[in-house]
């Protein structure tokens, strides 16, 4: 009996998952002309397929705000790859600070969490909140993030955080699940075409050390 209840509960959780890719398509259909969108990019390779898809409907500007990336040399290397992508697609860019100290303060008590554990949503929120704030200050119609392209990132969590910070700052968050429609596969193809460096860990040294 208990096993049947457990299976039922797990099936309910699966059923409750929101199709954020479908929600994005619905929002795009409602657009009255091109809108401005601030895209938080976690790295150049992930941004490729996201920009390719969004650029058809939005005037995209990328913000590269990733204080979780360590060490600083790695941050700069990934930023350099990001600039290659922006040049390819002719995308505007907003420079942002490397607030690694703030990231460390927010996550130090979660340093022993595994990659994909409780530390990750804190990191997502830090980056999405900054993006929403900048989007509001610069009168963007929408903001969103490339984070959902990764098969290792939970799009349900990312979109819920995006929605919450969007409501906080009064700017529309565009729901996404860029890994859908073979988005991740497309990012690999575009990365090869552009000869991009693809890192082998997400960003923070906590996660890198846990994965080694």
Q: What residue spans do the PLM features occupy?
A:
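Intrinsic-disorder-associated, low-complexity terminal segments enriched in Asp/Asn/His/Tyr and depleted
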Residues: 6-8
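Nucleotide-activated chemistry modules centered on ATP-dependent adenylation/adenylyltransferase
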Residues: 2, 13-212
């Amino acid at each position: 009996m208990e096993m049947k209840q457990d299976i039922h509960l797990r099936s309910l959780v699966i059923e409750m998952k929101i199709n954020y890719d479908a929600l994005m398509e619905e929002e795009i259909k409602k657009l009255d002309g091109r809108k401005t969108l601030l895209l938080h990019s976690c790295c150049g390779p992930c941004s490729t397929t996201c920009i390719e898809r969004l650029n058809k409907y939005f005037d995209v500007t990328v913000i590269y705000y990733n204080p979780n990336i360590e060490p600083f040399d790695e941050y700069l290397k990934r930023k350099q790859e990001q600039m290659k992508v922006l040049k390819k697609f002719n995308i505007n860019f907003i420079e942002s600070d490397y607030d690694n100290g703030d990231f460390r303060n927010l996550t130090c008590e979660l340093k022993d969490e595994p990659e994909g554990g409780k530390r990750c949503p804190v990191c997502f929120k830090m980056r999405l909140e900054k993006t929403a704030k900048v989007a509001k200050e610069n009168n963007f119609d929408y903001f969103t993030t490339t984070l959902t392209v990764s098969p290792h990132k939970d799009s349900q969590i990312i979109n819920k955080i995006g929605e919450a910070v969007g409501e906080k700052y009064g700017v529309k968050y565009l729901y996404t699940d860029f890994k859908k429609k073979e988005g991740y596969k497309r990012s690999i193809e575009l990365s090869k075409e552009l000869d991009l460096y693809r890192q082998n860990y997400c960003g923070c040294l906590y996660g890198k050390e846990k994965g080694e």
